[in-house]
């Protein structure tokens, strides 16, 4: 058997996994996922731009096929798939992805709807004008290069980057164990911030944010609040909220409202937003939208959302912000590579790193240019020396038998020149010698040795240079280069001069590429709830027996005298009638108790506002009611308190007391409020403080009055205890929690009513048959409702035909318990009173 290996090294698999994974992680972090703080580019983007530079694919040259660039990148610099490289190119060319595109694309490069770009064989690209500033001076030894994957090419480790690209275009990427998400900014603001930081490196963040107030996204939008921005700039991490920009349009003729969305948050897909809105409408999570269409064109974005007349556009818009990507959170995590290591960086650290990078670039560029100029000066000096001694040089060359002899004679001769001076200056500044300067051998003020480079240039000198004019030109160029050399030396020696050059270059970039901010920052933003958009108004809420609900402004009803005919409050079908009526504020929460003892939550303003003649909307469309379940009691509340109880009564005389605090957490599907027997239902709900008295009234005119203390507090799912004993033919119709002042108002089905003093109802024990509250006859009919009233009150009475009358309590007489009352509302033969509610006189406005 042949040997598989000559030597087997045993290693711990745990250690090998750790080391291998660490190597992989660092490779991803440094070589793929994170940008360099200096030029703001990941390796793939840097290599794409470098490949375009090598191909001379500049902004002012013709376009080249994307496939050509992709081929060069993966063949020379980036040994990865062509899809990854082309995807990077596409993103660099998308104006909705980058604040300042680095590639000028021609063809289909995708859309904000998420459409894919055309294949690379169809699209053409070239470098954008601003990208050229990233690569400018690359050929002046400004950055270091390293070998590519096979050692055949050289790649820059970073670009010179005249622009602060990391901030103006941002970056995002997921590495191993870390990620980065840096938002784009406005170039004018960032450069102004750079200039301020250069002038004062101890500048406060508050002062710096006067120049750089926050991110500026290519898709514009609205940033709500500055707290997240400040935190991100201070710590490197933060969260901001970006909202779409919208307006509400009102048609002149129809007065119909439409919500127009004309800017979306950054990186939000327009098509998905529209689809999401459509799904919300379909699932009835948002009510009131009639039409949804996309009218976007080359002029800009325009999503039109038409809504119903009776629907408040502000509420719909707030729901859209809450339920769709019209408002998103953007987590800022400013992680970048600095000195080859990933680091979470603050705004000042990023600016400082960029400025230090620019200092090094300018110094290396200046040194490169100085060496180049000194080399040229060196050659020019040799030519000037030769022209000053042209006759002697020609004679030496003529007398030489070979080229080598001529070079040797020129090299060893002591030459005189009245124009050459560079070598003498260098003699006085020996500390600044470059490799080219060290080749010079000064003798004295006006005598020189020629170097091999100078001798070669002399031997290659064209005869036309021997003219007097050409001689003067050489001397002029020599002096000009000498001045330039001095300037470059000053840059290297004087930090203030270098700083001025850096600032001048930044100002030039700002002036050439600066534009207006797109994203608006709402500095004084505070979270806006839907309720903030709703006026606080008192409304009449009606719920029909068939489950149609709506509200109307209370001020739309005028008070009438006793015996009035009333005003139509709601149009119902013949078989339907109003079962619940209450007055509440638009900002109240209504607790909706169903016939099955389930409690549902709803804001008053979430109910449909409708006219008097409208039936409203089925409440089953607003609440997740099951089959054979209907809302039987509604209780408006403004806040939850543990000291307050919800007291419930059923038609079979059962009562229950539970803390209001137990109902504070709304659930979409509702919660159990009371366990009911099969033939029982909830008829009344009220708030108590633990020391109230309770009154229950039956349809047959009986009443019981007992202390709340007799009913102990129980949990939500309890069945309760007996409050009043009733006959099988009777049922409880009202629950009253009496206050200190006022009377008890009773209304019958035939429109009779009366007021009775509370003290006429003695406080006794619960679970008794009670006392007579009203004399029941065929003339007045059974009791349909009772309530406590005071002299200033007004009441609203409604019939099963939809007729509503509003009258003052003072017009209703005070009578004893064993009386049938007086006519309050005249009803027709088939018409019956079905609901009673109090309207506070302080809130009434006659019309």
Swiss-Prot record:
Catalytic residues of the enzyme: 122 (o-(5'-phospho-dna)-tyrosine intermediate)
Single annotated GO MF: DNA negative supercoiling activity
Domain Topo IIA-type catalytic per the UniProt entry, residue ranges: 34-533
An individual GO BP term: DNA topological change
Reaction(s) this enzyme catalyzes, per UniProt: ATP-dependent breakage, passage and rejoining of double-stranded DNA
Domain of life: Bacteria
Matching CDD domains: TOP4c
SUPFAM superfamilies: GyrA/ParC C-terminal domain-like, Type II DNA topoisomerase
Enzyme Commission number(s): 5.6.2.2
UniProt main location, coarse: cytoplasm
One of the Pfam families matching this protein, by short name: DNA_gyraseA_C
PROSITE patterns recorded: TOPO_IIA (PS52040)
Subunit (UniProt): Heterotetramer, composed of two GyrA and two GyrB chains. In the heterotetramer, GyrA contains the active site tyrosine that forms a transient covalent intermediate with DNA, while GyrB binds cofactors and catalyzes ATP hydrolysis.
Note: Few gyrases are as efficient as E.coli at forming negative supercoils. Not all organisms have 2 type II topoisomerases; in organisms with a single type II topoisomerase this enzyme also has to decatenate newly replicated chromosomes.
Free-text function comment from the UniProt entry: A type II topoisomerase that negatively supercoils closed circular double-stranded (ds) DNA in an ATP-dependent manner to modulate DNA topology and maintain chromosomes in an underwound state. Negative supercoiling favors strand separation, and DNA replication, transcription, recombination and repair, all of which involve strand separation. Also able to catalyze the interconversion of other topological isomers of dsDNA rings, including catenanes and knotted rings. Type II topoisomerases break and join 2 DNA strands simultaneously in an ATP-dependent manner.
Family as reported in the entry's similarity comment: Belongs to the type II topoisomerase GyrA/ParC subunit family.
This protein's name: DNA gyrase subunit A
